[in-house]
């Protein structure tokens, strides 16, 4: 049988589909999520239901967001899951999680085996809804999880790290080998838990400033701050904040990036003509 066919469904490469089939890993993920009746649980990309079924067994109802119309149709007619599911056949990148949380009257518990080809932009989409989310559990490419949990000074530390750790407490849960999937991906995977802060430890006054600074600093990560952010902060301003201008983007802590963002918000740059 073609290695891309699983349970009669042909894995669509353009959707980044790899289906989880390792029962030990499935049980470990479900136990980590620990779904409870009465909670507003949302799965992104349920696929063939490897996680949907065991999670759904513990719930009276749940919401799924599935782009693939064939998979959405399969879930709709699932013998015991079907009646429990509210299915949105759409791209999670366009899904309004705040509207769903408002409808449910409580913050959402979101989980999923995310398609690796869109995992990073999808994480940024979800960060814009953290006020509507209680927690998130995701299977991701191990390299992405390493970036989420990285500390300053490591090669994995980047813009995704800073933004994720600004919004959430990030906790690695378990590693998942390629053979746990059909078809087996060429990379290792891992599960991560993200718990949005009720109040960020280092609040910023305008998130757009933090987004801009991290984009520009890590866009030139081999340059020193004097060069990558020199158009925004003078050496003297950096010194006032006890930030060494000879350091690179990967050496600056989340707290320091937040400090820079608040300074920039308080000292708006003149508009260019």
From Swiss-Prot:
S-adenosyl-L-methionine binds at residues 18, 20, 45, 66, 91, 113. The lineage of its organism: Bacteria, Pseudomonadati, Pseudomonadota, Gammaproteobacteria, Enterobacterales. GO terms for cellular component: cytosol. Pfam families: RrnaAD. HAMAP family: 16SrRNA_methyltr_A. Its EC number is 2.1.1.182. Keywords: Cytoplasm, Methyltransferase, RNA-binding, rRNA processing, S-adenosyl-L-methionine, Transferase. This is Ribosomal RNA small subunit methyltransferase A. The keyword Transmembrane does not apply. One of its GO terms (molecular function) is RNA binding. It catalyses: adenosine(1518)/adenosine(1519) in 16S rRNA + 4 S-adenosyl-L-methionine = N(6)-dimethyladenosine(1518)/N(6)-dimethyladenosine(1519) in 16S rRNA + 4 S-adenosyl-L-homocysteine + 4 H(+). It is found in: Cytoplasm. InterPro entries: KsgA/Erm, rRNA_Ade_diMease-like_C, rRNA_Ade_Mease_Trfase_CS, rRNA_Ade_methylase_Trfase_N, rRNA_adenine_dimethylase, SAM-dependent_MTases_sf. Its main location: cytoplasm. Specifically dimethylates two adjacent adenosines (A1518 and A1519) in the loop of a conserved hairpin near the 3'-end of 16S rRNA in the 30S particle. May play a critical role in biogenesis of 30S subunits. The keyword tRNA-binding does not apply. Belongs to the class I-like SAM-binding methyltransferase superfamily. rRNA adenine N(6)-methyltransferase family. RsmA subfamily.
